[in-house]
Amino acid sequence: MIAYLSGVVREVREGSAVVVAGGVGYEVQCPAGMLARLKPGEAAEFSTRFIVREDAQLLFGFPDADHLKLFDLLTSVSGVGPKLGLALLSAMPVSALAAGLIGGDVKLLSSVSGVGKKTAERLALELSSKVPEHLAAAASGAAGGKRPARVSSTAGHDAVDALLALGFREAQVRAAVAELLGADPEASADTLIRKALGRLR
């Protein structure tokens, strides 16, 4: 079992990163938000889940225990494998995902690629009472649908408007753009749109 990994990023790929630790390169599949922050040559730490199948051995990495806990909860639901669990964590911040689960927001959950209505309903039903208390508290404002994620910069507003025009849901769009701005407050609208599209599709 590999529960934690610390090393130097060698390469960032689509959906994963190669991390060198102890002279060995590990391919770590990560949420999109984490991948966007990884840079070759820099040190990185991951809370990990190692999954062994008949045809593959997969290592999933997360920035903290909260992401890992939510990943484990998601994949405990019938019909939700690790790839889909990762897709859900890539589509929005943990707090927004927790809000959707707590509030039974089937529309939000089913807006993620690969999540059908029945799966979204099952996620909401089975996990609404299992989300850790501190995540529930962080998401309590959003769970009522009254306070969308705050986007303060002009570039952020422009990015939100452009993404809404493409048909994405407002809660998802605002959450994605707000998280990107948190990582890079000076990001341009074009950069925000490009990176947000990678998460929302």
Curated annotation (Swiss-Prot):
SUPFAM superfamilies: DNA helicase RuvA subunit, C-terminal domain (SSF46929), Nucleic acid-binding proteins (SSF50249), RuvA domain 2-like (SSF47781). GO terms for cellular component: cytoplasm; Holliday junction helicase complex; Holliday junction resolvase complex. It is found in: Cytoplasm. One of its GO terms (molecular function) is four-way junction helicase activity. One of its GO terms (biological process) is DNA recombination. Residues 1-63 are annotated as: Domain I. SMART domains: HhH1. Residues 151-201 are annotated as: Domain III. Keywords: Cytoplasm, DNA damage, DNA recombination, DNA repair, DNA-binding. Its main location: cytoplasm. Residues 64-142 are annotated as: Domain II. CDD domains: H3TH_StructSpec-5'-nucleases (cd00080), UBA_RuvA_C (cd14332). Residues 143-150 are annotated as: Flexible linker. Belongs to the RuvA family. HAMAP family: DNA_HJ_migration_RuvA. Has three domains with a flexible linker between the domains II and III and assumes an 'L' shape. Domain III is highly mobile and contacts RuvB. The RuvA-RuvB-RuvC complex processes Holliday junction (HJ) DNA during genetic recombination and DNA repair, while the RuvA-RuvB complex plays an important role in the rescue of blocked DNA replication forks via replication fork reversal (RFR). RuvA specifically binds to HJ cruciform DNA, conferring on it an open structure. The RuvB hexamer acts as an ATP-dependent pump, pulling dsDNA into and through the RuvAB complex. HJ branch migration allows RuvC to scan DNA until it finds its consensus sequence, where it cleaves and resolves the cruciform DNA. Homotetramer. Forms an RuvA(8)-RuvB(12)-Holliday junction (HJ) complex. HJ DNA is sandwiched between 2 RuvA tetramers; dsDNA enters through RuvA and exits via RuvB. An RuvB hexamer assembles on each DNA strand where it exits the tetramer. Each RuvB hexamer is contacted by two RuvA subunits (via domain III) on 2 adjacent RuvB subunits; this complex drives branch migration. In the full resolvosome a probable DNA-RuvA(4)-RuvB(12)-RuvC(2) complex forms which resolves the HJ. This is Holliday junction branch migration complex subunit RuvA. It comes from Deinococcus radiodurans (strain ATCC 13939 / DSM 20539 / JCM 16871 / CCUG 27074 / LMG 4051 / NBRC 15346 / NCIMB 9279 / VKM B-1422 / R1). The lineage of its organism: Bacteria, Thermotogati, Deinococcota, Deinococci, Deinococcales.
